[in-house]
Amino acid sequence: MNCYKTHTCNELRKNDVEKEVTLSGWLYRKRDHGNLIFVDLRDFYGITQLVFNNDKDFFDEISNLKLESVITVTGIVEARTEDTVNSSISTGEIEVIVNNLRVESEVEFHFDEEIAKEERSILASITGEQEYPENMRFKYRFLDLRREKVRNNIILRSQIIAELRKLMIERGFLEIQTPILTASSPEGARDYLVPSRLNPGKFYALPQAPQIFKQLLMVSGFDKYFQIAPCFRDEDARADRSPGEFYQLDLEMSFVTQEDIFQIIESTLYRVFAKFSRKSVDKDFPRITYKEAMLKYGSDKPDLRNPLLISDVTEIFRDSGFNIFKSNIERGMVVRAIPAPKTAEEPRSFFDKKIEHAQKEFGAKGLGYITFDKDGTAKGPIAKFLDENRLNHIREATNIEPGDSVFFASDKENEAANIAGKVRTLLGSELSLIDDNIFKFCWIIDFPYFVYDDKSKKIDFFHNPFSMPHGGLKDLEDKNPLDILAYQYDLVCNGIELSSGAIRNNKLDIMYKAFAIAGYSRGEVDTRFGALVRAFRFGVPPHGGIAPGVDRIVMLLADEPNIREVICFPMNQQGEDVLMGAPSKVEDKHLRELSLKVIE
């Protein structure tokens, strides 16, 4: 028999009345009624009310015991009177009359009064659920995790990972672990480097993704691979990105097309989202090309809950009387229009605030706008420069109704798309156009294979260098590199990128040619990707994969705005683990063993 408990704090019911039971847990709440003290005892599973009578010799002990101390009690289960039943907890029809108390661990505050004050305040948050600054919460994460909301997020994370693993195994995937200490690779972010003691001056890298290893598994003859993979990237924190470490459902398949990958992911994620959320889940996963996404949504991560669509109205303003846009177009710029439904009667301040916000927050040089009154009359700073024919074309292009308005952004194509996309998001939110009770997915496909880097003044890979280009070797040899598309795809949900993937290049000549266009010599490719080059000489199946982010999936399903809320021991925005004190300095002796010297 377990000496600490016969039941959990979520088990006892009316049919347990008169039983002697033993319970263990944390002293969650305490109510002193003079001759009686009522205690809510909490364990991982729930809460049970305990009753301490003043005729017991441990009455003073429980009276003086601090909240969150750990105790073990033995007592008799009694039914509560009808007027004291607590329907908010599953054990609310009973209470335990305590006959024996043993204190397992008592809370002791720090001797420094300032630190003790901090400890008391964070301890109080467990029962009050009030919020505290992030660094304080993370410093006392072991207490923060006792809060119901935070604990439930971690439980949900565990359940989601278990479900993902189950679904992958059901679909015939093998779970295989790939190395954590590996070589640096050009994934697009900075590597975390680990010095080698046995090889002075050389470094391992923590994997940004198991990219090459999973491709090597396909070359090895494994047909379907997956793992819940830890990945490491030295990136700044964002609301949807944790600094340093994250997890992804990493998978790869042989002899597949892009659509085969899509079908696996769609069926898997639909089941997971439908199971773990009360929100509705749209079964449709539309395919949107990168070019279309940037035009219509101003982003390659479009939120399809937002009904607003951006339109290209460059030709409408070409040779128009509005000289600012006319001049921009003559210099190769574009004009994008963003509809704003039912805003024509808003005061001037409404439009001025949007313009000011776009300038300060989005880097826009400015925004133009036209309002269309309910009688169809066009007004605003731009309207007087346009004839009725051009105004009608704007109405048609933006599909607006009388009483609507239209905002305009003009700049170079990429900048105009970015600004218009952010204005679209702003309007969707402020005009309450976004349905918060649904998940909408989409695939972004046909990404550019290459991009011109203005800083380095050279062509570079737009995304994944190991993907298959449309048209294969022929397009690499015959086309303008900036016109070549890739079999690369992103999965987006409610404006958040959940995963990236690609059909991989499985031909050595294509690999050499693609890297040559990006400025890599054959020797550099052989040196940096030696394992992959060797493998590609020995029969490579067509293969592809994807890696949905586990943290982001949990964040969406937990309905949390910040990804750190679904990570058990997160870093803060500065990439610091304030609980463990990492990163930290190391002893000079250790540095010498690693042939390292810190430059101040």
UniProtKB/Swiss-Prot annotation:
A single BP term in Gene Ontology: aspartyl-tRNA aminoacylation
> Which residues are listed under the site Important for tRNA non-discrimination?
33
Q: Where is this region: Aspartate?
A: 211-214
Q: Which GO terms describe its cellular component?
A: cytoplasm
Q: In terms of domain of life, where is this protein from?
A: Bacteria
Subcellular location(s): the record lists:
Cytoplasm
Q: Which UniProt keywords apply?
A: Aminoacyl-tRNA synthetase, ATP-binding, Cytoplasm, Ligase, Nucleotide-binding, Protein biosynthesis
Q: Where does ATP bind?
A: 233-235, 497, 549-552
Stored InterPro entries = Aa-tRNA-synt_II, aa-tRNA-synth_II, aa-tRNA-synth_II/BPL/LPL, Asp-tRNA-ligase_1, Asp-tRNA-ligase_1_N, Asp/Asn-tRNA-synth_IIb, AspRS_core, GAD-like_sf
Chief localization: cytoplasm
Q: Spell out the molecular function terms from Gene Ontology.
A: aspartate-tRNA ligase activity; aspartate-tRNA(Asn) ligase activity; ATP binding; nucleic acid binding
Q: Which protein family is named in the record?
A: Belongs to the class-II aminoacyl-tRNA synthetase family. Type 1 subfamily.
Quaternary structure, from the entry: Homodimer.
Fetch the NCBIfam families from UniProt: aspS_bact, PRK00476.1
| Name listed for the protein in its UniProt record | Aspartate--tRNA(Asp/Asn) ligase
- Give the originating organism: Wolbachia sp. subsp. Drosophila simulans (strain wRi)
